[in-house]
Amino acid sequence: MDLFISSQLLLLLVFCLFLFWNFKPSSQNKLPPGKTGWPIIGETLEFISCGQKGNPEKFVTQRMNKYSPDVFTTSLAGEKMVVFCGASGNKFIFSNENKLVVSWWPPAISKILTATIPSVEKSKALRSLIVEFLKPEALHKFISVMDRTTRQHFEDKWNGSTEVKAFAMSESLTFELACWLLFSINDPVQVQKLSHLFEKVKAGLLSLPLNFPGTAFNRGIKAANLIRKELSVVIKQRRSDKLQTRKDLLSHVMLSNGEGEKFFSEMDIADVVLNLLIASHDTTSSAMGSVVYFLADHPHIYAKVLTEQMEIAKSKGAEELLSWEDIKRMKYSRNVINEAMRLVPPSQGGFKVVTSKFSYANFIIPKGWKIFWSVYSTHKDPKYFKNPEEFDPSRFEGDGPMPFTFIPFGGGPRMCPGSEFARLEVLIFMHHLVTNFKWEKVFPNEKIIYTPFPFPENGLPIRLSPCTL
């Protein structure tokens, strides 16, 4: 009897071991570690709070240290989300665009920014046209317009002033440039009208997605529709005047319009222009503001930029505009822009959605889950950037940072097509700024907060004095 019981217990033990080894949760079947926080809200409030306190990287770095340096789970914007970290994570996500992941935006943002849902073929065709219009080798055609507009901006709004709010100035300039280069509007009244609507759109994008009359979200939707209406009028005028050719994005898209799936309606085109208006405005104005911010803190770097820009200025006639050759000479200034965007990235990251289940770092990433890649998993990591809190443009000399560590505009097939366009705007802005002024911050320790775009909490007021070199 005892032998029978013992044999039964032995068989039971063997069976349990069999189940344990064959059906235990494998690391390959585990979700990435982390927490999803409160229902619906998730960890969104904590994410926002870190940005508003001027420390957006805290949300990412704390969780990397607590859960995994490669990938962790959270919940943002009402979605279960996996955050990919480090250069390897960035490389994986950017290299698998249209294979395992595709670009995605929270529904609240899409509600404001898109009036139509274009087909896959139409989306690809539209993006191809944008990339072609903004490709680096085509940038030379924008220089004269950018330079002329920027020069006039400084004459109208900076000259004769002893103090300005630099961030508001950068926003004003980038909006003027965007209106002209995207759809050739430069009438001050019309630009001001669009700017007023644009501010409502931005406020709506940053608000709770409550679509009731009187809410910022509702006002944002209405303002976006009014901008589309204004653009539709321009599109109709442009179509009726077929002999008129302009070198703006609107004409580029309209002249390339195809048939069937590649035919773009007025709303398709208006959506594209609205999206580019927002993307070009926030990234560029942020970079301009950051350059002003850091050059005020580092006189020796300002002096190097001034020397470089003065050499170019002295080689020009009084009314002669900048050329492509001049832009290519602005090497140190370009490094300054890159370092400013490393410390204060124009965007905190981007979203993707998983189209096919896959494993990464021994964790499973389910189909349908959302992914967030963050600039902060690399931009301030001492593993990639020595003394990461220091402002040091020399990091970008020679070969510069290792691949997939400096990603202010993303990477891969969905990398922001306007990255070089934005740098060009900032370089021309820097040229006119440093050759005319030196400055100091009114609030020396002014903090940069994120809402979610970077913004100096006091608007970056600066005291101006004439350049003396």
UniProtKB/Swiss-Prot annotation:
- According to its UniProt record, which reaction does this protein catalyse? (20S)-protopanaxadiol + reduced [NADPH--hemoprotein reductase] + O2 = (20S)-protopanaxatriol + oxidized [NADPH--hemoprotein reductase] + H2O + H(+)
Q: Where are the transmembrane segments?
A: 3-23
Q: In terms of domain of life, where is this protein from?
A: Eukaryota
Detail which positions bind heme.
C416
The cofactors it requires, by name, are:
heme
Pathway in which the depicted protein is active: Secondary metabolite biosynthesis; terpenoid biosynthesis
For membrane topology, the record states:
Single-pass membrane protein
> Which InterPro entries does the UniProt entry name for this protein?
Cyt_P450, Cyt_P450_CS, Cyt_P450_E_grp-I, Cyt_P450_sf
User: Which tissues is this protein detected in according to the database?
Assistant: Accumulates ubiquitously in all organs of plants, including roots, stems and leaves.
| Keywords recorded for this protein, A-Z | Heme, Iron, Isoprene biosynthesis, Membrane, Metal-binding, Monooxygenase, Oxidoreductase, Transmembrane, Transmembrane helix
One family name in Pfam for this protein: p450
Q: Where in the cell is it found?
A: Membrane
EC number(s) of the enzyme?
Answer: 1.14.14.121
Principal subcellular localization: membrane
Q: Name one GO molecular function term.
A: iron ion binding
Q: How is its activity regulated?
A: Activated by N,N'-dicyclohexylcarbodiimide (DCCD) thus leading to increased ginsenosides accumulation.
Q: Name one GO cellular component term.
A: membrane
User: What does induction of this protein depend on?
Assistant: Expression is not affected by methyl jasmonate (MeJA) treatment. Induced by A.niger mycelium-derived elicitor, thus improving ginsenosides production in adventitious roots culture. Slightly induced by Tween 80. Influenced in roots by relative humidity and photosynthetically active radiation (PAR), and in leaves by temperature and rain.
Q: What class of enzyme is it?
A: oxidoreductase
* Any one GO BP annotation for this protein: response to molecule of fungal origin
Q: So what family is this one in? A: Belongs to the cytochrome P450 family.
Q: Tell me, in a sentence or two, what this protein's role is.
A: Component of the dammarane-type triterpene saponins (e.g. PPT-type ginsenosides or panaxosides) biosynthetic pathway. Catalyzes the formation of protopanaxatriol from protopanaxadiol during ginsenoside biosynthesis, a class of tetracyclic triterpenoid saponins.
> Under which name does UniProt file this protein?
Protopanaxadiol 6-hydroxylase
Species of provenance: Panax ginseng (Korean ginseng)
